[in-house]
Amino acid sequence: AMVDLISTNKTDFFREPSHFNTLTDLVLQEYVKSHSFSTFKVWSAGCSSGEEVYTLAMVINEFFESHKGYLFQILGTDISHQMLENSRKAIYRFKDVAAMPLYLKRKYLLKSKNRELQKVRIVPELRTKCKFQHLNFMDATYEMADSFDVVFCRNVIIYFEADVQEKV
């Protein structure tokens, strides 16, 4: 599709680690103080091929392991149907996960049975907590059926003109 030719799909696992540190050190800490056993909902806008979504899933899952009784759901949206399909498959090359801490690789990645492929897949326990859907911010009326505790919109809004950023 044309959108795949013109959109930027730059993304990495644990891109800009300080954002994830803020999530655990501040946002999630405050969340557990003010919410008893509930579902923490995150929206990753412009999720590309899913690295940010699955990074969020790992970080949140790690946090909630020491705060029992909490669940989480993550919605990833993107304009590209191809990127969304890649996100749902959750298959990545070894080099895509090279910078990920070893203990997280062991816990959250499954190696391909075919070793020559040099690919991994996100474990089902995380994949089931992550949903993906198409969204175009340029549509005059886009509606989200859900409310969210946190919205990550950091890798998409920078590509819009100031007036469009304001509308988004």
PLM features: residue spans?
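A short glycine-rich, Lys/Arg-flanked "PGG" loop and its adjoining helix->strand segment in the class I
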Residues: E166-V168
